[in-house]
């Protein structure tokens, strides 16, 4: 379920704020979104994998907390991330 190194570096390059940025909320949300999408595909095939379902719920909660933080600090960056990732809210 982990992201490939190339996928991860590509996502970081797309959402980083400066050259050495790897931990900004935008980057973290983008990485979590990709992991969530992979888990959703896994669960479509393996319907009864409840351990992975719990992990998915934890990732969604972590992403929600990061988005709440970003929304409270900078609403414009929040909207940009939501629109670029195609998330509802």
Curated annotation (Swiss-Prot):
Q: Which UniProt keywords apply?
A: Ribonucleoprotein, Ribosomal protein, RNA-binding, rRNA-binding
Q: Where is the composition biased (Polar residues)?
A: 10-22
Gene Ontology MF terms? rRNA binding; structural constituent of ribosome
| Annotated Gene3D superfamilies | 6.10.250.3130, S15/NS1, RNA-binding
Does the entry feature the keyword Ligase, yes or no? no
Cellular component, GO annotation: cytosolic small ribosomal subunit
CDD domains xref list: Ribosomal_S15p_S13e
**Recorded family membership:** Belongs to the universal ribosomal protein uS15 family.
Described by its record, this protein's role is as follows: One of the primary rRNA binding proteins, it binds directly to 16S rRNA where it helps nucleate assembly of the platform of the 30S subunit by binding and bridging several RNA helices of the 16S rRNA. Forms an intersubunit bridge (bridge B4) with the 23S rRNA of the 50S subunit in the ribosome.
Q: What is this protein called?
A: Small ribosomal subunit protein uS15
Q: Which gene encodes it?
A: rpsO
């Amino acid at each position: 379920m982990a992201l490939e190194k190339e996928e991860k570096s590509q996502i970081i390059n797309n959402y980083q704020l400066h050259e050495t940025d790897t931990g900004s909320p935008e980057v973290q949300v983008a990485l979590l979104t990709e992991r969530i999408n992979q888990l959703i595909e896994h669960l479509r095939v393996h319907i009864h994998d409840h351990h992975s379902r719990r992990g998915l719920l934890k990732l969604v909660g972590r992403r929600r907390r990061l988005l709440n933080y970003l929304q409270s600090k900078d609403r414009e960056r929040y909207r940009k991330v939501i629109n670029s990732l195609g998330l509802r809210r």
